[in-house]
Every structure is written in structure tokens, then in C-alpha cells.
Amino acid sequence: MTTRLTAWGVTGIGEIKPDDQLGDIIVAACRNEPNGPLLDGDVLVVTQKVVSKAEGQLVAIDPTNPLSHKQLVEDEAVRIVRRRGDLIITETKHGFVCANSGVDLSNVERGQAALLPKDSDRSARRIRDIVRAQLGVEVGVIVSDTFGRAWRKGLTDVAIGVAGIAAVVDLRGTADALGRVMQVTEVAIADELASAAELVMGKSSGIPVAVVRGADPGWFREASVSELVRPPQEDLFR
């Protein structure tokens, strides 16, 4: 475990457009960071929106017709979980259960909607590989997005893609502070790091990338965000 984490938003990213080389842009911004260069063991958290923009995951919708957005949400879903008014909870092609299939109208031009990246693990790996090649450091990369929670109000950022950092840290079989063996404890470490990073990025500050420093060395490994998706046979509410 770690007893100290520090996090800061990376400034100077600017507006991202389709076909921009996001990894190169992030590296350039990190070179100019007043907090100093990236170090081995840092974690880069990158918001889904800039990843989707760079990868061209933008589609045109009719902003005057609510049915246009609704149809797009349904097209991006493999299953409709719940409906209430304009809100639709869906399961996406990635296995995520979230509002509106992750289709987002915020921070994009009117008449556009941003879709989730096709493969956010791959997106994270690309950024990680560019950082490694250009800066010579080994970092973890998390692609984050904002999700609601079924049983609690409010939004929080979670991981939808990872590279070089665990999605889940399995503590089953280890002892707690009183020596009892833990039977079910699996920590969603990538989600926790994504949430920590969101505190220094915000929703409207124009800072889409953050660095988290101080992660436990044991968290770094090759992984996939699919580790966070609960299998249907284990889901009590499906």
C-alpha cells in the first residue's frame, strides 16, 4: 500500500481535434509542467472526452430533435437496463452499465455527440507507449469517465481503460490489521486513482489530464479494464 499520493492537473493541453496525436500532445505538455518531468511510477489519468475526440469518436446529431440523441444511445447499447423519462441506463458494447451508453453532449460542439472509445485499453496503451518512447519513463495510464452510482447520489470518475497499471488489486488471502484473512476484498484501484485525479481536473476547467504520483509499485502490471466488469453470473441485480 501507499501512505502518500500527490496529484496535479497538466495544463497546456488545448482543444483536441480528430486525428490529433494525443500522446504527443500530452508528452509536450508534461515537458513544460511546473511540477517537473514525469517519473517512473507516475500514473497519467486522461479523460475519455479527449481520447474520443482524438480518435474521431464524434457523430452528428440534430440538437433540435431529442429523438436523435435517444436513437444514438440505443444504437450504442447492447441492452437497455432501465428507462425513466429521458434517462436510459444501458449496458454498452464494452460491458459497462452506465447512463445513456456513455454518449456525451458536454464539451463538444452543438450538433455533435461524443461516443466512448472503441477500445480504451488500447487507447491507454498507445499513450503509455508514446510516453515510454519519448520520455524514457515507465508510467501507468488510465482513461477515465464520469459515471453515476445506482445506490448513491452524485457522480464520480472511474477507469474505462488501463495500461501498465492494475484495474483491480486482489487482497483475498491476505491478513487484515487484526490478522484475519480477507476472503472477498478486491480493491478497484484504477477507479480510485481516476477519482483522485478528477479532483484536480474538474468538469469545466479545461484540464483533461492529471498526474498521480506515489502509487504503490505493486499496482503496476499489465491489465485490462475488463477486470472491473462483473460477470453476469456474479451479478445479483441483472
Spans of features found by a protein language model:
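N-terminal, positively charged regions that mediate nucleic acid binding
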Residues: T2-D62
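A structural signal for small-residue-enriched, beta-sheet-centric alpha/beta enzyme cores
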Residues: T2-G14, Q48, L58-G111, L115, ...
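Phosphate-interacting basic helix/loop segments used at nucleotide- and nucleic-acid interfaces
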Residues: D20-G36, K118-L135
